[in-house]
Amino acid sequence: MQFKNTPQRYGVVSAALHWLTALVVYGMFALGLWMVTLSYYDGWYHQAPEIHKSIGMLLMMALIVRIIWRLYSPPPIALTSYSRLTRAGAAAGHLLLYLLLFAIIISGYLISTADGKPISVFGWFEIPATLTDAGAQADIAGTLHLWFAWSLVIISLSHGVIALKHHFIDKDDTLKRMTGMSSSDYGAQK
């Protein structure tokens, strides 16, 4: 597998960032669902949110790297089997996934810094609080964070189902290209 993307397939960096993001998103979603079940006297009550915040800030950095990488190493050319509607739907779906990722991280940041305190990322460094208002900010951002999380999980699951549909029903190379396999069916614009 090549380092950079080619017209036929994704490179190792893009594939690693894609799968790592997916694992982190589902792990963070599970952690978030578990955190809200903890009682004040549970040993993880204070520790779990700190882990959640730290991973969230690292995910933000990874997303920035991912976007820079995407500009440096553009994705493979669309398969010839894709209709114009399929290409437009894929572009819209990917944009929505990126927007939701940033929205969920920003809303999480606003929850975490509403009290004016910075976010400590595993004790390595701190992300300063910029916008602070301990009252409404935390409540509004918390509601948005919840909705963004559910939306992201539902849309990313749809993304996965669509990739599987391409692989098993359409029998095209969509999924293969994200796993490092090359495609000969690329480049035409319908």
Say what each PLM segment does.
Residues 1-190:
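Membrane-embedded alpha-helical bundles that constitute the cytochrome b-like, heme-associated redox core
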